[in-house]
A protein has these predicted regions:
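Positively charged n-region of N-terminal signal peptides that target proteins for export
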Residues: 1-4
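Alpha-solenoid helical repeat scaffolds
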Residues: 6-505
Length: 505
């Protein structure tokens, strides 16, 4: 009798110690509503442990996995639901979103079929973006907005697209709509902060990101945004402290890793860069920030041949990138190929905007190659005129960051030789365009294009001036398409190509 009573008591204790699946499901729903998706996933998985066949719980798990970017997990959950007999248009849309996350945009488009809902158009836009077809993506966003102009997720994706395309007036209208639809939501605060940062309104950006960090303490995105702002303002140590906070929440989050690498690079902590990225070496895009930081880490840690190979690939993929050109020349010099290093760095050192680092590298390469230009390069590096040009170039760059366009024009316009330098002219074209001086902008942009007609950035600027001033549409489209062909991975050019192709004829 005593044994039976003891067994009954143990069974009762075990039953009481089990968490009620319904209670865990309720907690998961609450966490999902609060946009704490990691907590929602943990809670709903716990609920499914006790009620594995619950369809509502599995649907919440799939939605949570999609929010967390876990395409494989979402696909597995959705397959279980299908096998259990669930079939609906919403399920097809969720499968399409999972396919996009898994790198299968064409499968996503097939799954969406003829679905004409706003959410379906949003997913088509995401799939077309993944395909690199920005014009089709923008068209899908606009079609979705025609169906439901107040669909929060769709308005958010449209705002993000417009910011990428640097269409800030239209992006501002989209952000205002987000504020109306969900004033306290994370994506509203983050998008408002992103737009403010792009407009040079750093105080407003910080206010939005700080509000997001306070309201959503379990999310890393507000913290990484604040860290990026601190880095922009030169506060590297403050940025590191914020990233450390984010790492406690989600150490493997891509934004945490990216900022860890960036800040370590700026501090010259190359061993941290190497350790952080060594497991990703095979999949790193050499032209990405992480790819080039890893290559520089290899160079600084005594592996110049590997670094040279990575920088050569980066420059091949993005020939107008000055950093990859500079670092390739550094690596070439490090392996003893001084003459090639001099040829590589020459487009940078010849520019009126040449920095001290580029000119110093040219001097070292010329000396090592016994090139007769070494003396003239050294004389220029040591000259008062070069130092004065450096001050003006730095002032112009600082003005660009704060978007003081008249100051940009004033600074670069005082640099001797700017009228024959494509890089200086392109920056002046942007400043004139943003100042409302379309004719002046066009003259600068076209002169830059004449000087370097195969440069994707110059093609893009010449097209952008025409796009935003509403002139010569055929020429604008030709230039924008040429820029996109030369630099197909450039998201700004892709977004502007979409705007150009969707602009009225």
């Amino acid at each position: 009798m005593k044994r039976s009573a003891l067994l009954a008591a143990l069974l009762l204790l075990a039953a009481c110690s089990r968490t009620d699946p319904a209670a865990q499901y309720a907690s998961a729903q609450k966490a999902f509503a609060a946009e704490d998706y990691a907590a929602a996933r943990a809670q709903v998985l716990g609920a499914l442990d006790g009620d594995g066949g619950n369809r509502d719980m599995m649907l919440l798990l799939a939605r949570t996995q999609l929010k967390l970017g876990d395409g494989d997990g979402a696909q597995a959950t959705l397959t279980r639901l299908e096998e259990g007999g669930l079939a609906s248009a919403e399920l097809s849309r969720m499968k399409a979103e999972a396919a996009i996350l898994r790198g299968q945009p064409q499968a996503a488009l097939t799954l969406l079929g003829r679905d004409n809902t706003a959410d379906a158009w949003r997913l088509r836009a995401a799939a077309q973006n993944a395909n690199g077809n920005s014009p089709a993506a923008l068209d899908a966003l606009r079609r979705g907005l025609a169906v439901d102009p107040r669909n929060y997720a769709l308005v958010h994706d449209h705002a993000r697209f417009l910011i990428a395309a640097q269409d800030y007036p239209a992006a501002g209208k989209a952000v205002e709509t987000l504020r109306q639809l969900g004033p306290g939501r994370l994506d509203t605060l983050m998008m408002a902060g992103s737009l403010a940062a792009k407009l040079g309104q750093l105080a407003a950006a910080k206010q939005n990101f700080s509000a997001a960090a306070d309201a959503f303490p379990a999310r890393v995105e507000p913290l990484t945004a604040l860290a990026s702002l601190a880095d922009m303002e030169g506060q590297i140590d403050a940025a590191l402290q914020i990233v450390a906070r984010a790492a406690k929440i989600a150490p493997n989050h891509p934004e945490v890793i990216d900022l860890t690498v960036l800040l370590a690079s700026e501090k010259g902590d190359w061993e941290t860069v190497r350790k952080t990225l060594v497991g990703q070496e095979a999949t790193l895009d050499p032209r990405s920030a992480n790819g080039m930081s890893y290559a520089e880490a290899l160079l600084r840690l005594g592996h110049p041949e590997q670094a040279r190979a990575m920088f050569a690939q980066a420059l091949l993929l993005s020939p107008q990138n000055p950093y990859s050109r500079l670092m390739l020349a550094e690596a070439q010099l490090a392996v003893g190929d001084a003459r090639t290093a001099l040829r590589t760095v020459q487009p940078l050192s010849d520019s009126v905007l040449a920095g001290e680092r580029a000119l110093d590298l040219a001097v070292r390469a010329a000396k090592a190659a016994n090139d007769p230009s070494a003396g003239a390069l050294l004389a220029r590096l040591q000259s008062p005129a070069f130092k004065a040009s450096q001050q003006l170039a730095n002032a112009g760059q600082a003005a660009m960051v704060r978007q003081d366009w008249p100051a940009v024009l004033a600074a670069f316009g005082q640099i001797p030789g700017h009228e024959n330098d494509a890089e200086a002219l392109r920056r002046m074209a942007l400043a004139a365009l943003r100042s409302g001086q379309a004719d002046v902008a066009l003259s600068y942009a076209d002169r830059a294009l004449d000087l370097a007609p195969r440069n994707a950035d110059n093609l893009h600027m010449a097209a952008l001036v025409r796009l935003e001033s509403g002139r010569d549409r055929d020429q604008m489209l030709r230039l924008m398409k040429a820029a996109s062909q030369l630099d197909p991975a450039n998201r700004v050019i892709r977004a502007d190509l979409a705007r150009a192709m969707n602009a009225g004829g």
